[in-house]
Amino acid sequence: MNPRRQKRLGIILAILIGVSATIGLMIYALNQNMDLFYTPTELVNGKDDGTKPEVGQRLRIGGMVVMGSVRRDPESLKVRFDLADVGPKVTIEYEGILPDLFREGQGIVAQGVLKDATTVEAFEVLAKHDEEYMPPEIAEAMKKTHAPLQYSEEQKQGSGQ
């Protein structure tokens, strides 16, 4: 093999090794950051295909905060509450300031780590609201600046052409 061909082969091998390493690192990073979504029933009973998360696995869980289940530690920001859908309850432990929309009976999504079969240690809690929600400040500002539209009879009838 002449030196020119040997140099080309070395460059091609280096490029292939570099691309393979890059793809491998990207797949590893995506697997580390992938959080699977569960409902409380799926967390306890498993998904339809029978898969259940392992203790220590990162996940997202969504459901309704059970009425009367919120327990706050008076000496810290620790909060424990139960989350349920139509089946079993799951306990969420969170340390931090809860969102303004958080309340009992409200839908939330918590992101965290599975501590045991029915307990999730959350590091983020998101309160859910419907698409018609508008913060009070914005609603008030819109009332001041946007007058209701007045339509003529012709506009209400539409152009009959």
Curated annotation (Swiss-Prot):
User: Which stretches of this protein does UniProt put in the Cytoplasmic compartment?
Assistant: 1-8
Identify the residues that bind heme.
129, 133
Name of this protein? Cytochrome c-type biogenesis protein CcmE
Q: What is its main location?
A: membrane
Extract one GO molecular function annotation from the record: metal ion binding
Which segments does the topology annotation call Periplasmic? 30-161
Q: What residue ranges are annotated as transmembrane?
A: 9-29
Q: Which InterPro entries match?
A: CcmE (IPR004329), CcmE-like_sf (IPR036127), NA-bd_OB-fold (IPR012340)
Q: Which gene encodes it?
A: ccmE
**Assigned GO CC terms:** plasma membrane
Disulfide bond residue pairs: none
> Where does this protein reside within or beyond the cell?
Cell inner membrane
Fetch the HAMAP family from UniProt. CcmE
Family that this chain belongs to = Belongs to the CcmE/CycJ family.
- The reply on keyword Cell membrane is yes
The record lists the organism as Vibrio vulnificus (strain YJ016)
Keyword vocabulary terms for this entry = Cell inner membrane, Cell membrane, Cytochrome c-type biogenesis, Heme, Iron, Membrane, Metal-binding, Signal-anchor, Transmembrane, Transmembrane helix
Topological relation to the membrane, as annotated? Single-pass type II membrane protein
User: GO biological process annotations for this chain's record?
Assistant: cytochrome complex assembly
Instruction: Determine if Magnesium is one of this entry's keywords.
Output: no
What this chain does, per the entry, is described as: Heme chaperone required for the biogenesis of c-type cytochromes. Transiently binds heme delivered by CcmC and transfers the heme to apo-cytochromes in a process facilitated by CcmF and CcmH.
Among Pfam families, the record links this protein to:
CcmE
